A protein has these predicted regions:
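Phosphate/ribose-recognition catalytic cores of enzymes acting on nucleotide-derived substrates
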Residues: 197-312
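ATP-dependent adenylation/nucleotidyltransferase module used to activate substrates
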Residues: 81-82
Length: 312
């Protein structure tokens, strides 16, 4: 897959393409459904397939007080897009100037003149251009004027629900990780660096790695204890473990922390990059009467996870 950053200029060797455009947060199954049509059509027509996306969420530019909670920061999004088999990803720098372009000018100046889009697939509910004021019928008319075919992709439904980034975020925010996995098409993941923690887990017999997220805009699941798989650094192995998200109420904590205990692992993780894939939520976080009572519950949590993962 070739990645192009438009603010650095547009390559002169771009061929005519079949393309689609969007922010693609999560690259969920609805996105995958749309992109599969782009890739298949491009192959049938002997053209390159292209995804056009943005380096930041448009609302970050349009609303100064907006704080995004992303399913996938840019680099992870590019990794997931590469897995779809698309030929080219063009990353646009979304700024105030770009937000002022009408749909017509966006299609003419960027899609036609710079990216050589011959056929454009539009998601069933997607709009672009200044204030998102125009819709699919307008895009078709502009495309006809420019010699660009515009096609609307059908909706992708799962159990009667339109799969969208909003739906995926709602599941993650509620700790509904199995539902999130069904919508995303893969287990939700977060990554970061292991930093010094409180050492409380080690004293209880459950040493934990305290994770500092690589991107603070990342959406964090609801507080609770989760069954997870963990990858350390560049290792290919995903190890089973459990993660606590919350304020550590048994120890009087107030700030939310992300702590993961990896089963059957005794290595030193400080400074390492780790990635956590969420399988399911085991229970909510709660305050225990003593550290010993918490340790007993953690032992039960671990057994619950081992039993469930051995059966699944």
């Amino acid at each position: 897959m070739r990645t192009i950053y438009l603010q650095k200029g547009c390559p002169a060797d771009l061929a005519a393409s079949v393309a689609t455009i969007g922010f693609f947060d999560g690259v969920h199954r609805g996105h995958q459904f749309l992109i599969s049509h782009v890739v298949e059509t491009a192959r049938e027509e002997g053209r390159q397939s292209m995804i056009i996306t943005f380096d930041q969420h448009p609302r970050e530019v349009l609303h100064a007080d907006y704080q995004p909670r992303l399913l996938t920061p840019l680099q992870e999004k590019l990794y997931l897009l590469e897995r779809t088999g698309v030929d080219v990803v063009a990353v646009l720098h979304f700024d105030a100037a770009l937000s002022q372009l009408s749909a017509h000018d966006f299609m003419h100046d960027l899609l036609q003149e710079r990216l050589h889009v011959a056929k454009l697939f539009i998601g069933y509910d997607h709009r672009f251009g200044h204030n998102r004021a125009e819709g699919f019928a307008d895009y078709v008319a502009y495309g006809r004027e420019m010699g660009m075919e515009v096609v609307q992709n059908p909706v992708f439904e799962l159990e009667g629900v339109n799969v969208s980034s909003t739906v995926c975020r709602r599941h993650v925010a509620a700790g509904e990780m199995e539902a999130a996995s069904r919508c995303l098409g893969y287990p939700y993941r977060m990554g970061g660096r292991v930093v010094a923690g409180f050492q409380e887990g080690r004293k209880l017999g459950f040493p934990t790695a305290n994770i500092q997220l690589a991107d603070p805009r990342r959406l964090v699941p609801a507080s609770g204890v989760y069954a997870v798989r963990v990858k350390v650094g560049d290792e290919a192995t995903w190890r089973l473990g459990m993660m606590n998200i919350g304020t550590r109420p048994t120890f009087g904590g107030e700030k939310v922390s992300l702590e993961v205990h990896i089963f059957d692992f005794a290595g030193d993780l400080y400074g390492c990059q780790v990635e956590v894939a969420f399988l399911r939520r085991v229970r909510e976080e709660r305050k225990f009467a003593s550290p010993e009572e918490l340790a007993a519950q953690l032992a039960r949590d671990k057994q619950t996870i081992l039993d469930a993962c051995c059966l699944s």
